[in-house]
Amino acid sequence: MFDDMVNLFNLGAFSDEEKELLRTDFTYKKQMSRLLKEARQAAKRDTCYFCGKSVTSFCNSHSVPRFCLENIATNGDVLTLNTVVDNPLMDTENGVNKAGTFHLICNDCDSKIFSDYENPDNYSNQPTPKMIAQMALKNSLKSISKRLFEIEFFNISAKKTDAARMFSDAKNAANEMDLKEYVDSYKKAKKALEKNSSVDYYVCYYEKLNYVVPIAFQCSLALSVDFNGNIINNIYNPSPEYRIQNIHISILPLKSETVIVMFIEDGDKRYRQFYKQFNKLTLDDKLAALTLIMFMYSEDMYFSKSIENEVRESKALCEAGKTGQDIISFTPFFDPLEILRESHSLDKRHEIPNLLSEKYKLS
């Protein structure tokens, strides 16, 4: 069971035989369900993360604005990355009410602090600095929630076997570092929102498409390489002084249009070459790059059933969806950064269906 707990966080790690066993082994499913429930309960707070007030229930917050999910849903359902990953421990389909949700703040705070960017009427023009700060705040909260859960999950699994303890200790050492950085980003976003600052974030790309794309996405990502293969984030740097830098990407399908926003924290200079290279691409090439980046770096994308066949039948998309950053070189003869460059090469955008292009539009 320990290997399966590890594979829950290692997309695409199961063999076909293991997948079939996990789909039919109801005893195992019950054990895993209990473990996940225990981890969620252990990670649950008794105060709102934003205002600090005691609460008995939390808001069902969405990482992607609910109205965007509704715009691409079929009978209230959207597909997840598991459509290509095929991990038997993950859902392939989610109802809009459960897609990308987290429970960290109270209903009152959720309704107030995200009110600007979660209003579809506010996208007639480029998002305001306040809306950008709200996006950054939401991304930070989602990341914090995810890491709090994973820390408890691995704390619990560490009690199972010695092997589980060794793996869990190593995983949680990284999780704790991630959590600290997410909390720092959260504090920055909260401060920017409270003072209505226009200088804390730099919007490096904004586009409004005159059609509805079949994908809804909002996340902060730590890109590894740029278009020329230069390292942006060295995930192997052991120094506690080295800070991973994230880029925020939002792909928001409206009723008849789509808004795309990409921004960074002001001062995050490692992305400078990346966004300069990106902005020189044609529109189609930009959309292909964004499609690849979503599949390669995040699990938190949701898409319409209208493109299910295209997604399932693309071997390149499936491989991109299974790409992880836990890449380790087990021999001194191989440079892990070279492996990272190859596995995360943005040249692969030419091999995948460009799901953000007009060809796949919903309307």
Predicted regions and their residues:
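Non-membrane alpha-helical secondary structure
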Residues: 1, 24, 129, 133-136, ...
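Phenylalanine-focused residue identity feature
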Residues: 2, 9, 14, 26, ...
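Generic structural hydrophobic/aromatic packing signal, biased to beta-strands
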Residues: 48-51, 137-140, 144, 217-219, ...
